[in-house]
Structures are given as structure tokens and as C-alpha cells.
């Protein structure tokens, strides 16, 4: 399974990419929604994990773009703002995480999207207490 992680905070971006790699999945990173759109047009992804509040193109706009252009891609939204999470759900996010979240929460969200994509690959689960957000 291949994921695209989108966040304007480079620390969160690096942590999430490292965690997803440990889970055994391919991952690309984008610093905002505009960069994510470029990557989505160039490559194939199963899941997009995106923050809500970003410059240029925010996560809500990105959700709308993904659902309009690639409805087969699952979206996991992230934000510390509950109203932004609701907006992301309304824009097409399949699942939302409130920041900060723990490793088990992101793993569970990815695993659910993994199962929904019917991929034949096995999901590797780690057992750490790392937090992102």
C-alpha cells in the first residue's frame, strides 16, 4: 500500500513518514495541499493522510479535490481543531484524527483504510508509544 502524507509542519511530516515506513508501507510527503495535488497527478496512492490547516491549498480543499478526481483513494484527516475535522469529514475524509494522537490511533486508521482497499499485502503492526501532533 502507498500513502501520501501532507502536513506543513516538517517535524510531524517526518514522524508520520517514519512511522508509516515502519508499518511496511510506501510513503511520499508533501508540505501543503498544492504539492500533494502535483504528486497525486504523478503517482498512484491508496491513502492520503492530511492536516487541515496548511498554506496555499488546505486539507479541506485537498479532500474535495481527491474525492472529485480519485474517489477510490481513502483520506485520513488530522487537526487539533474539532470544527476543521468536521469540515474535512463533510469534504470527503473517510476518517479523522484529533491532534495530538498516538501511534495506535494512526496505525488503526491506516489499517482500516488498508482493509477497505482489499490489498493482498500484510499489515505490519508496531508496538510503540510515539506521538505525533
Predicted regions and their residues:
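Acidic catalytic/metal-coordinating carboxylates
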Residues: 31-35, 58-62
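Active-site residues of response regulator receiver
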Residues: 51
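Receiver (REC) domain active-site loop signature in two-component systems and cognate sites
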Residues: 54
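Hydrophobic/aromatic residues positioned on beta-strands within the core alpha/beta folds
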Residues: 76-78
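C-terminal output helix
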Residues: 101-112, 118
Amino acid at each position: 500500500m502507498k500513502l501520501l502524507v501532507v502536513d506543513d509542519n516538517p517535524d510531524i511530516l517526518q514522524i508520520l513518514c517514519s512511522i508509516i515506513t515502519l508499518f511496511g508501507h510506501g510513503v511520499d510527503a508533501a508540505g501543503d495541499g498544492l504539492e500533494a495535488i502535483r504528486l497525486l497527478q504523478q503517482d498512484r496512492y491508496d491513502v492520503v493522510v492530511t492536516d487541515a490547516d496548511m498554506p496555499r491549498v488546505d486539507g479541506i480543499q485537498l479532500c474535495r479535490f481527491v474525492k472529485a478526481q480519485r474517489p477510490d483513494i481513502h483520506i485520513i484527516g488530522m487537526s487539533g481543531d474539532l470544527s476543521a475535522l468536521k469540515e474535512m469529514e463533510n469534504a470527503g475524509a473517510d476518517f479523522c484524527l484529533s491532534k495530538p494522537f498516538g501511534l495506535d490511533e494512526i496505525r488503526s486508521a491506516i489499517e482500516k483504510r488498508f482493509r477497505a482497499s482489499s490489498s493482498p499485502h500484510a499489515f505490519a503492526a508496531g508496538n510503540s508509544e510515539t506521538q505525533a501532533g
